[in-house]
């Protein structure tokens, strides 16, 4: 959506190495530090250790729940309940305003702990509607969870796929557990691979950004890694993260105890280079813990070992608006702080076309408009204003509309396909312009034109309502 031709300045255009991605994918990935090589210098992430169980035993993994001295996937210092997790997210988001994404990556598999995982995601979506949600999984039960992931607003999913050969899979995995049955050997590999591919295809068909993680294991799966990249790219995955095997005896894994060699830097680089011919590569992965907090390569989890009382936490919406201004400033290199810059909201099913009725929108895409260009800042989720065909009048949903007004208090305009007369008037009373002239058109056409027309008519000191 953002292009150098959108505005004269062009300072916020995507880096050249994002050229393999569509504009929509590049915009969505830009603020996710694990999905964007440039984003990880500017935005922070948080992993929530709420998922202890696993349905797949990998020979390179040994889960630990009370470990503070190992830096690798599958370990955490503690386990959190969903209720504790959302308190911790609020605590961290207040302390680290660069936080853009919260993910569940273990210590086991999130989808093997489906009740805990979805309760956590639902609480975050309800209480912190602007945070990006992601999840990392082995993919075994992914096909069964796609619809629920979409419903709760997860739009980034990482799937660990180490091979597409069932015989090789039998060397990597000791067993899997599915529908009350335990499988091993080639049979387990066939089941796992089929379900992983099905899950990836279903996610990408729904517009979810899928990253593939693969552990490079010399002498086992290294020769077939380019085939993994090729097949998963064809299935719609957009980036491949090839990670070196960690196999040290002190970690207690099968490979570590059996002396399986780790790949050297040259082997890893050569494999990434071959795979990069068919699929963009992630090369900045730090193989984070299941409780990592902060920028990539900067784990601040030990600063947040004590949970505050929920009632002691400040209201979230003022923090949300402050964070939006900061994230816009980061993404535009300060241009969003100019007097003629502003934030706007778009009612859209996926962010690139204005295609939703105001009352039917369950999320708004927030864009920064400035001399730097049009930049996607975040998505904000909300209960729909209209709950049905006959429930779209203010007397029926005053509380819902008030909540939407509070959520959008820092924007100058709302773009949608249609909007009722009463909410139109109420938005105008709050200084928010309802815009329907761009219905069914790309945001990349409508928003820049609107900004160019309006920018000269605003006062020199443009107030940002709702921002403390």
From Swiss-Prot:
Check the UniProt entry and state the signal peptide residues, or none: none
What keywords would UniProt list here?
4Fe-4S, Iron, Iron-sulfur, Lyase, Metal-binding, Nitrogen fixation, S-adenosyl-L-methionine
What is the enzyme's main class?
lyase
Q: Which SUPFAM superfamilies match?
A: Nitrogenase accessory factor-like, Radical SAM enzymes
Task: Specify which residues bind [4Fe-4S] cluster 1 according to the UniProt entry for this protein.
Answer: 54, 58, 61
Q: What are the recorded GO MF terms, alphabetically?
A: 4 iron, 4 sulfur cluster binding; lyase activity; metal ion binding
User: Does Iron show up as a keyword for this record?
Assistant: yes
Which pathway is this protein assigned to?
Answer: Cofactor biosynthesis; Fe-Mo cofactor biosynthesis
List residues binding S-adenosyl-L-methionine. 60, 108, 160, 212
Q: How the cofactor binds, per note?
A: Binds 3 [4Fe-4S] clusters per monomer. One cluster is coordinated with 3 cysteines and an exchangeable S-adenosyl-L-methionine. The two others probably act as substrate.
Pfam families given for it?
Nitro_FeMo-Co (PF02579), Radical_SAM (PF04055)
Q: Which residues bind [4Fe-4S] cluster 2?
A: 285, 288
Instruction: Cite the Radical SAM core domain residue spans from the record.
Output: 40-289
User: Which Enzyme Commission number(s) are listed?
Assistant: 4.-.-.-
**Which Cys-Cys disulphide bridges does the record give?**
none
Under CDD domains, the record lists: NifB (cd00852), Radical_SAM (cd01335)
| Protein biosynthesis listed as a keyword | no
Entry's Gene Ontology BP terms: nitrogen fixation
Q: Which cofactor does it need?
A: [4Fe-4S] cluster
Q: Which family does it belong to?
A: Belongs to the radical SAM superfamily. NifB family.
Instruction: Sum up the protein's function in the record's words.
Output: Involved in the biosynthesis of the iron-molybdenum cofactor (FeMo-co or M-cluster) found in the dinitrogenase enzyme of the nitrogenase complex in nitrogen-fixing microorganisms. NifB catalyzes the crucial step of radical SAM-dependent carbide insertion that occurs concomitant with the insertion of a 9th sulfur and the rearrangement/coupling of two [4Fe-4S] clusters into a [8Fe-9S-C] cluster, the precursor to the M-cluster.
Q: PANTHER family from the entry?
A: FEMO COFACTOR BIOSYNTHESIS PROTEIN NIFB (PTHR43787:SF13), FEMO COFACTOR BIOSYNTHESIS PROTEIN NIFB-RELATED (PTHR43787)
Which protein are we looking at?
FeMo cofactor biosynthesis protein NifB
The primary gene name is: nifB
């Amino acid at each position: 959506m953002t292009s150098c031709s959108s505005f004269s300045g062009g300072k916020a255009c995507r880096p050249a190495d994002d050229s393999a991605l569509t504009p929509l994918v590049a915009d969505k990935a830009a603020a996710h530090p694990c999905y964007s090589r440039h984003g990880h210098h500017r935005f922070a992430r948080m992993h929530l250790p709420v998922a202890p169980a696993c349905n797949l035993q990998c020979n390179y993994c040994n889960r630990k729940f009370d470990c503070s001295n190992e830096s690798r996937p599958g370990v955490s210092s503690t386990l959190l309940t969903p209720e504790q997790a959302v308190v911790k997210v609020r605590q961290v988001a207040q302390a680290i305003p660069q936080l853009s994404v919260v993910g569940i990556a273990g210590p086991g598999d999130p989808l093997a702990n489906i009740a805990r995982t979805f309760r956590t995601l639902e609480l975050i979506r309800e209480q912190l509607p602007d945070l990006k949600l992601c999840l990392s999984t082995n993919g075994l039960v992914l096909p069964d969870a796609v619809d629920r992931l979409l419903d709760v607003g997860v739009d980034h999913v990482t799937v660990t796929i180490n091979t597409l050969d069932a015989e090789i899979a039998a060397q990597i995995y000791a067993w899997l557990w599915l529908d009350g049955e335990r499988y091993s050997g080639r049979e387990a590999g066939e089941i796992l691979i089929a379900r992983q591919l099905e899950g990836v295809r279903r996610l990408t068909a729904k517009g979810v950004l899928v990253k593939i993680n693969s552990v490079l294991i010399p002498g086992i799966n290294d020769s077939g890694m380019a085939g993994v990249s090729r097949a998963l790219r064809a299935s719609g995955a957009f980036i491949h993260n090839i990670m070196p095997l960690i196999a040290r005896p002190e970690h207690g894994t099968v490979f570590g105890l059996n002396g399986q060699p780790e790949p050297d830097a040259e082997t890893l680089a050569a494999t990434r280079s071959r795979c990069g011919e068919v699929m963009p590569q992630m090369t900045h992965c730090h193989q984070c813990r299941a409780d990592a907090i902060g920028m990539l390569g900067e784990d601040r989890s030990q600063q947040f070992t004590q949970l505050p009382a929920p009632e002691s936490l400040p209201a979230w919406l003022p923090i949300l608006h402050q964070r939006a201004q900061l994230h816009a400033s980061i993404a535009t290199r300060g241009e969003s702080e100019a007097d003629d810059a502003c934030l706007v909201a778009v009612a859209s099913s996926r962010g690139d076309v204005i295609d939703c009725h105001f009352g039917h929108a369950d999320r708004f895409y927030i864009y920064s408009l400035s001399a730097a260009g049009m930049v996607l800042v975040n998505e904000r989720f909300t209960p729909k204003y209209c709950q049905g065909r006959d429930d779209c009048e203010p007397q029926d949903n005053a509380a819902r509309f008030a909540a939407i007004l509070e959520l959008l208090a820092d924007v100058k305009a709302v773009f949608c396909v249609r909007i009722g007369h009463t909410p139109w008037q109420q938005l105008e009373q709050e200084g928010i312009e309802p815009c329907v002239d761009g219905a069914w058109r790309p945001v990349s056409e409508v928003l820049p034109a609107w900004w160019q027309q309006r920018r000269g008519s605003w006062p020199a000191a443009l107030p940002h309502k709702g921002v403390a």
